[in-house]
């Protein structure tokens, strides 16, 4: 009886091992078929309240719209929204470490509006943006610089000087460049919130569409 008992146990154990191994083989394709988010190239949108989606519901900011556009076009990027309401270019410098830790392939930089609204000197804005772009360039990160403008009451001289600062910085750092992120929103009803500053969900979709042509040469499939 004892030998039979030993054989029976061996057979059961062997059968259990074979069945378990078979189940692992069946499960393996399910585990490996899922592409980890970390393996997708990261695109960081780094900016102020325009990037953050101030006043909008979840999923309505322009980085959210950009993610949808990229997904539809077959690009497997993971868009990371690093927008902070009220942020100035000084805050952009302070937050660089957080952005660099994400190891992004591309960064869209959108700052400057709050500098103007707070009356910060244009030289300071230019210097801070230069520092941000230098850090990204030194890390071999592709850059898209998104320009902004300010209301007419800031004066034509200041507005033109700000626009020139964006142009010269984009050229210096070999960045893709969109001179005016709000270009597609001008005189289009329903694109700006009641505060007269921030885009609506519709406006965010248009901003994403405005950025995409300049962004595409930086993308890889």
PLM feature segments, named:
Residues 19-28:
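Bacterial N-terminal signal peptides
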Residues 8, 12-13, 65, 75, ...:
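Alpha-helical cap/lid subdomain in secreted, periplasmic
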Residues 86-90:
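N-terminal helical cap/lid subdomain that shapes the substrate entry/recognition surface
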Residues 33-85, 95-103:
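Serine-esterase "nucleophile elbow" of acetyl-processing enzymes
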Residues 4-20:
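Bacterial N-terminal signal peptides that target proteins for export
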